[in-house]
UniProtKB/Swiss-Prot annotation:
The mature envelope protein (Env) consists of a trimer of SU-TM heterodimers attached by a labile interchain disulfide bond. The gene is env. Residues 386-406 are annotated as: Fusion peptide. Specific enzymatic cleavages in vivo yield mature proteins. Envelope glycoproteins are synthesized as an inactive precursor that is N-glycosylated and processed likely by host cell furin or by a furin-like protease in the Golgi to yield the mature SU and TM proteins. The cleavage site between SU and TM requires the minimal sequence [KR]-X-[KR]-R. The R-peptide is released from the C-terminus of the cytoplasmic tail of the TM protein upon particle formation as a result of proteolytic cleavage by the viral protease. Cleavage of this peptide is required for TM to become fusogenic. The CXXC motif is highly conserved across a broad range of retroviral envelope proteins. It is thought to participate in the formation of a labile disulfide bond possibly with the CX6CC motif present in the transmembrane protein. Isomerization of the intersubunit disulfide bond to an SU intrachain disulfide bond is thought to occur upon receptor recognition in order to allow membrane fusion. This is Envelope glycoprotein. It comes from Simian retrovirus SRV-2 (isolate 2R-18B1). The YXXL motif is involved in determining the exact site of viral release at the surface of infected mononuclear cells and promotes endocytosis. The 17 amino acids long immunosuppressive region is present in many retroviral envelope proteins. Synthetic peptides derived from this relatively conserved sequence inhibit immune function in vitro and in vivo. Residues 23-514 are extracellular.
């Protein structure tokens, strides 16, 4: 068959056929698109719901709310955690039976009550819930007895239900008061260990009593942004050439991604920090998730860190000693709390993770709305497409945020905020010095009293008799006076700045009193100035109209009456 034998319509059909490419494509792009639709857990891309979903893939605690990833939409839906009602104590408990634990999704508010010299929690039951093992309907059996992860709630809806303030080991109430009490207990225990090993260090990320260069943020946050930009510049220089690094306002919640580090130390060389709330990502997609498990000893010395509910543990490593996280890694345990050190008597399950800051990237060529213009023009702010840090760094387990909109800048309030924080810190420090002075004085008085009671002054003094290492009076009254004097000088300086302002000192101090009278005086002055002119104009206009009316002639129109002669007969009398 030659070319001439091929019909023309076949040739036309060949040229009109669209080119089709076959293949699965880059899986990293698919993961990025999926995460752009899902968002981060605490962003609540699926919105807030009243009741928690019955079937979900993972759950993440976000302090004030709990995020659930349901199996139908995969967007994180959030449920607000119950709060302590007004009048936190109602007296005697309205229940006769008390449960060990009640899930937080079964009530909205709770109160404290007493029964038998013990404190319990009580609330009105809003719904029933069956206890679950593992993450929803995915069972995760750990050990022989401690396998229940999520508590339930059974009873009559609309009636009071009471339960213990302390949950059993390895049982979670879904971010309710029992989980918060467990977190506080673990935090206190870690703080005790930290105080016994390291000196106390006071630092507040927002306290800037003095200017620290041109930056308007604290040094720690600035160093974090600098390190993030350096890493971004090495991994993706095109994006780092011109971009914005955006930090969310409020308490930071870092991102936790799985770590491949398998080295676990048991010494105390690692830093000990309080439990840190994180957002675990990509753990639900792990095929081989390795978890660390320490069984409970069923005693009061157990430090219950909880069980993980955001991943399925395929392999479990039993641990019976303290753990120190490897460099740049943390242990993420129950209620997605991160730890750098787990004490000897810890119990629960944890996974090893790497933390990254919750920073979003806005490319330099992306249109960013100006908040001030949008505010004054009453326009809705345009959505800014953020690029998550994980995508910018080229990590395959990339995550995108569901955040839209850009927060208002607080640069204008930096000076005022810094000054207010400085004043509050100075007052707080002064009160603390007063308290230290009172404590020191009380200790000295107590030592003298004990020494006088024992009559041991002749044996070398009270300190030697009592074998006290510290026997002096820490007089901080001078420091208190200096700080109060500094505050007074600062206030006097501000008053002087106000007094030196010509706006308030003009006319020998009479200007502030004359300002309220300025408006009526101005109105009176305008009336006196332009009143006669306006009055003359009105009089002239009226006179002109009257003259025009008088100048017009009066026209009178009349007609002669017609006389009608009928030609009648007249009688003539002679």
């Amino acid at each position: 068959m030659t070319v001439k034998d091929i019909p023309f319509w076949r040739v036309l059909l060949i040229f009109q056929t669209a080119r089709v490419y076959a293949g699965f494509g880059d899986p990293r792009e698919a993961i990025t698109i999926i995460h752009q639709q899902h968002g981060k857990p605490c962003d609540c891309a699926g919105g807030y719901v009243i009741t928690a979903p019955t079937v979900y893939l993972a759950t993440v605690s976000c302090s004030s709310h709990t995020a659930y990833q349901p199996s139908d939409s995969l967007k994180w839906r959030c449920v607000s955690n119950p709060t302590l009602a007004n009048g936190e104590n109602i007296g005697n408990c309205p229940c006769q039976t008390f449960k060990e634990s009640v899930h937080s999704s079964c009530y909205t508010t709770y109160q404290e009550c007493f029964f038998g010299n013990k404190t319990y929690y009580t609330a009105i039951l809003a719904s029933n819930r069956a206890p679950t093992i593992g993450t929803s309907n995915v069972p995760t059996v750990l050990g022989n007895t401690h396998n229940l992860l999520s508590a339930g709630c059974t009873g009559t809806v609309g009636q009071h239900i009471c339960w213990n303030p302390k949950a059993p080991v390895h049982i979670s109430d879904g971010g309710g008061p029992q989980d918060k009490a467990r977190e506080i207990a673990v935090q206190k225990r870690l703080e005790e260990i930290h105080r016994s090993l390291f000196p106390e260090l006071r630092y507040h990320p927002l306290a800037l009593p003095k200017a620290r260069g041109k930056e308007k943020i604290d040094a720690q946050t600035f160093n974090l942004l600098t390190a993030t930009y350096s890493l971004l510049n090495k991994s993706n220089p095109n994006l780092a050439n011109e971009c914005w690094l955006c930090l969310p306002s409020g308490n930071p919640v870092p991102l936790a991604i799985p770590s491949n580090d398998s080295f676990l130390g048991s010494n105390l060389s690692c830093p000990i920090i309080p439990p840190l709330l994180v957002q675990p990502l990509e753990f639900i997609n792990l095929i081989n998730a390795s978890c660390l498990y320490s069984p409970s000893q069923n005693n009061s010395f157990d430090v219950d860190v909880g069980l993980v509910e955001f991943t399925n543990c395929s392999t479990t490593l039993n641990i019976s000693h303290s753990l120190c996280a490897p460099n740049s890694s943390v242990f993420v345990c129950g209620n997605n709390k991160a730890y750098t050190y787990l004490p000897t008597n810890w119990t629960g399950t944890c996974v090893l993770a790497t933390l990254l800051p919750d920073i979003d990237i806005v490319p330099g060529d992306a249109p960013v709305p100006v908040p001030a213009i949008d505010h004054y023009l009453h326009r809705a702010r345009r959505a800014v497409q953020f690029i998550p840090l994980l995508v910018g760094l080229g990590i395959t387990t990339a995550v995108s945020t569901g955040t839209t909109g850009l927060g208002y800048s607080i640069t204008q309030y930096t000076k005022l905020s810094r000054q207010l924080i400085s004043d509050v810190q100075a007052i707080s420090s002064t009160i603390q010095d007063l308290q230290d002075q009172v404590d020191s004085l009380a200790e000295v008085v107590l030592q003298n009293r004990r020494g006088l009671d024992l009559f041991t002054a002749e044996q070398g003094g009270i300190c030697l008799a009592l074998q006290e290492k510290c026997c002096f009076y820490a007089n901080k009254s001078g420091i208190v006076r200096d700080k109060i004097k500094a505050l007074q000088e600062d206030l006097e300086k501000r008053r002087k700045e106000i007094i030196d302002n010509p706006f308030w000192t003009g006319l020998h101090g009479l200007l502030p009193y004359l300002l309220p009278l300025l408006r009526p005086l101005l109105c009176l002055l305008l009336l006196i100035t332009f009143g006669p002119l306006i009055f003359n104009k009105i009089i002239a206009f009226v006179k002109q109209q009257m003259d025009a009316i008088q100048a017009k002639p009066i026209q009178v129109h009349y007609h002669r009456l017609e006389q009608e002669d009928n030609g009648g007969v007249y009688l003539r009398v002679s």
